[in-house]
């Protein structure tokens, strides 16, 4: 397992469009995912312990952000041939098990991850309603183990600020996780 941190936030970088299949049987574009106050794009996978430690918090935060007009989407860009736990079938099972309220998309060509410069799982990208990047940080202090329940909710607080002001926080702690499994 190669451990990486996400890159710094390149404020105001415009989101790149995509058209990816979801576990719900639909294809999703950037515009279809955008909420009235913003969008959270999450590069995740099924097998990484850093993702597993925050899965339930991702689900919680996505539900709460939805109430603020901020939609969420998860994208899996790993090589599913060499990492069968990340297969489309297993993506669907995980989404059903955890009751994902957001689309879970497969980036089989890995082009979307490359366009976004995603490097690890989880890697979070918070956009304002104008499709401008405002957050590229961690969910919270969790690593391979889930952080205490009363830990600061970095991602949620940043996305709430983006929804209210159209701007993200200047100070951001990078996300940390397994490298994306490139083909």
Predicted regions and their residues:
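Amphipathic alpha-helical surface "interface" segments used
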Residues: 175-183
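Chalcogenol-based redox active-site neighborhoods
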Residues: 1-163, 168-171, 179
């Amino acid at each position: 397992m190669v451990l990486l941190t996400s890159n710094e936030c390149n404020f105001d970088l415009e989101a790149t469009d995509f058209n990816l299949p979801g576990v719900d049987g639909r294809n999703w574009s950037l515009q279809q995912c955008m909420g009235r106050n913003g969008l959270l794009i999450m590069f995740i996978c099924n097998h990484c312990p850093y993702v597993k430690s925050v899965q339930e918090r991702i689900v919680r935060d996505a539900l709460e952000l939805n109430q603020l007009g901020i939609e969420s989407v998860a994208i899996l860009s790993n090589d599913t041939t060499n990492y069968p736990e990340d297969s489309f079938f297993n993506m669907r099972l995980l989404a059903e098990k955890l009751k994902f309220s957001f689309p879970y998309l497969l980036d089989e060509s890995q082009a979307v991850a490359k366009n976004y410069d995603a490097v690890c799982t989880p890697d979070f990208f918070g956009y304002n309603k104008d499709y401008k990047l405002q957050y590229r940080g961690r969910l919270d202090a969790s690593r391979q183990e889930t952080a205490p329940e009363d830990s600061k909710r970095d991602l949620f607080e940043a996305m709430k600020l983006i929804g209210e002001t159209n701007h993200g926080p200047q100070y951001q702690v990078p996300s940390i996780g397994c490298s994306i499994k490139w083909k």
